[in-house]
Amino acid sequence: MKFMDDSKKQEPREAEPMPSKQVTRRSFLGRSIAGIGGLTTLRATEAQLTDESGGVGRAAVRSQGRSLKSKRFSFVEILRVPDSVTLYGAVVKTLPVNPIRLVRNGEQWTSKGCVVESEVGKDSLVLTLTAGTMPMSLVHVRWTADVMPNLIVLGDAWERSYGELGWRGIEPERVMPWYFATHDGTICHGYGVRTDARALCFWQLDQEGVSLWLNVMNGGSGVILGERRLVMATVMIQQGQSGEEPFSGVQSLCRSLCARTSRPIVPIYGANDWCYSYGRSTAESILRDTEFTVGLSPRGGVRPYSVIDGGWENGTPRWPDMGVLADGIKQRRARPGLWVRPLEAAIGTPRSLLLPDARFGQAVARAQELAYDPTVPEAQQKIREKLHQVAGWGYEMVKHDFSTYDLLGQWGFEMGPMPTIPGWALNDRSRTNAEVLVELYTLIRESVGEAVIVNGCNTVGHLGQGIFDLQRTGDDTSGRQWERTRRMGVNTLALRLPQNGTFFVVDPDVVGITEAVPWKFNRQWLDVLARSGAATMVSAGPPAHGPEQMAALRDALALASAGGNAARPTDWMQTSTPERWQEKADSGRSETRQYYWSGPEGASPFLGP
């Protein structure tokens, strides 16, 4: 085993200065941050017989009305007609109201002119909704089962994660967007919806069964489908086998959920200025960063990126010409990238093109930030022009940000079971929020072209699969407080790493090399990023120019340019920030590396912005 913290001495902890006024990507842009469903007494009507993997066999179907066996299983068969389906036309404050309990007729569920179809296929279950002119907000699908009580469970996140991911025991109220996996100590099973879902979906698991909630809202109101038959989601399962590593099991689940062909997986590494400059960069400083990064990168093979994050303004003294700057980055043998906020609208934009202020609820200060409604054709054209301009300047990576917040009115950590605040709607009432998000992502891809690398930040990665090359999977890391990097960066790298190479390349955010963050931590963070095969981006503040830092950067960038060593966490079921990582050594044998993320004083309970 290799130990990545050479000190391991009880040395005084390095200072982590905290500025009096911290800047984040949110606050920089003026941000002011400030399941109750149809229960059923029905029991499962289909077979639950043990198969060779210790799960519930799909093959044997028992007659309706027979009681369940007393034995509990680690695998729950959900590729069958559900045991209940309940619709909700609206949400008031925080609660769904006006439940419509549907009546089953074969694979179809009906009531009051609404129809949910549960089409059982060989390896999937397709859920569709027809509701006519009746506004529809939520669909609650329930499968009853005797679930093994000692399972540990992993869920995903709505957009970026915020340090909350992890394997935990059964928590019946836990909201698990998109997919979840279980482990009984021997076998890992997975359940999820495909990435072409047209509803915002989350799962719940308890000892009496499984729930799938399909949010079909339009803004914060019920969608009005009219004559449309909405294919809400396709449910998939990944039944594990004894002896399979849990990481491989979750990776296989992610692969099975891909509804589109994933973009080519290529090494992504280089420079991003945010976590040392925090919006204070200039064209000149970007070129200096580019020269520094290129000088430490391998001369052949995949070229590094130099990404300009938030704070640039074309045609100003600090940023005189963004097209000329892109050319300057290319001349220095790097690939230029640029941060954009696609839905941001200028002051004076006609209200008819904008999203309603009501999407922010009581957070009225947020309404000062104007955003286009992407269901308005003229607003779509404004978004298209913005992206065309960036591609026309010659940028080879577009990092688009804030679209989930701008569209839905909340950050991921605020959403819980409700991604939007009730009481408002989009201009086009016939589209679900999930559909509008995918249409926006497709518009961005079409606007910049197939050759440009598209990086989604504050985006719903599950819905961006096959559209995005790269996805920021966690909230911001930091060049000002190590705790933020430990909590946000290490957590998202480890727990969402199964998405790397299946959905897209995962981007856990940058290594912010500054005086405020102890090098002994950043050195390890840099190392594990490069070895994992995830995007390895560096904000190189002045300390990065030290000899030890430059040597570590040279090694890490060389490894990242080659795609890493497929390092994966081995203690990810025991901790939210795994410290033991296994990779394939040059000899072909596995090698384990031990990292130390907390230091002698332990992790901080306090988190800076």
Predicted regions and their residues:
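N-terminal secretory signal peptides that target proteins for export/translocation
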Residues: 1-18
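N-terminal secretory signal peptides and thylakoid transit peptides that target proteins
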Residues: 14-36
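Aromatic- and carboxylate-enriched substrate-binding clefts and catalytic-loop regions
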Residues: 302-515, 521, 549, 554
